[in-house]
Amino acid sequence: MQEKLKILTIGDYESSTLENYFKDSKNIEFLELTLNEGIEKLNSKLFNREIVFLRSKEDNLEKLLEVGRALKEKEIITTTILEEKLVMENKEDLKKSIDAIFPVNKKGDIENLLLELLKMIDNIIFGLGFINLDIEDVKNMLKDSGITVFGSLNINKAISEEVIIKNINYNLNILEYLIKGYSFFLF
């Protein structure tokens, strides 16, 4: 079985650019969980060899934490992107429930940062390039990262794609120090 990156949407979520961007990808799978469903519904679709990206509206934080804890107990690596204010208010609960948390300055930036993060990780694991890591390497990085590996990245319409990519490439250099026992060249 090939490992995949999974995006688990909890509750209602508007139409997403993620689904459009990755609609033909064999490496990324989208899953949904309503607020009244338990994580057991997805037992046959989630494995500890995968990375699960959790996304939910701000008012569904309790369900996000519940799902995060359940997946963490199964040793499934979880990551999410939340508004910075929400992260700071719930720091301890989030650390106990989610492996890697990426705060953003504004709610509207969540989808953009998640898209860039998924593109980068998809390319690192499944793409052809300078960095050739398997999913276990990336899982180890995310498992040990806690709140924000990349720092807050404020994405708005005035920032060009080139600047965003430059920021992400710069932040890849930070990841180099998180990989224990590995040495490789980044850009």
Spans of features found by a protein language model:
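Tubulin/FtsZ superfamily GTPase core signature
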Residues: M1-F187
